[in-house]
A protein has these predicted regions:
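Extended hydrophobic leader/signal-anchor segments used for secretion and membrane insertion
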Residues: 1-123
């Protein structure tokens, strides 16, 4: 018998160590980042996410949401602007929400297309 109540989903925390410099200068090799499992969280442009690589299923990568193409398709980029420094949506295309595993617990400031996204930097 249902009383209109649904179980409360408590986000699971996950600590990840950065490997590589694709998210530099925001994160550098060896930095530790706290993520929350996605659950029913809404994703926004500027969020930093932990993603299952679309072609290398055993590889999880950290990228920033650059564009939301539809409710379930995301264009992801690394923060490092050096050519060849990031494997992201420029090389593997749009990513389905089902491949996004977690989102950072805190928000980090970046500049996207000359527009500053107001995100608080908390380390």
């Amino acid at each position: 018998m249902s009383h209109g109540l649904e179980p409360v989903r408590v986000p699971k925390k996950l600590k990840v160590t950065v490997q590589g410099n694709s998210m530099s200068p925001t994160f550098k090799d060896g930095d530790k980042i706290q993520f929350l499992s996605l659950g029913g969280s809404r994703l926004n442009v500027g969020d930093i996410v932990l993603v299952r690589h679309p072609f290398q299923k055993r590889l999880n990568i950290i990228k920033r949401i650059k564009e939301i193409k539809s409710r379930n398709l995301y264009f992801l980029e690394g923060d490092n602007n050096e050519i060849g420094s990031s494997s992201d949506s420029h090389s593997f295309g749009l990513v389905s929400k089902k491949n996004i595993l977690a989102v950072t617990e805190n928000k980090f400031k970046t500049i996207l297309k000359n527009k500053s996204i107001n995100k608080e930097l908390i380390c």
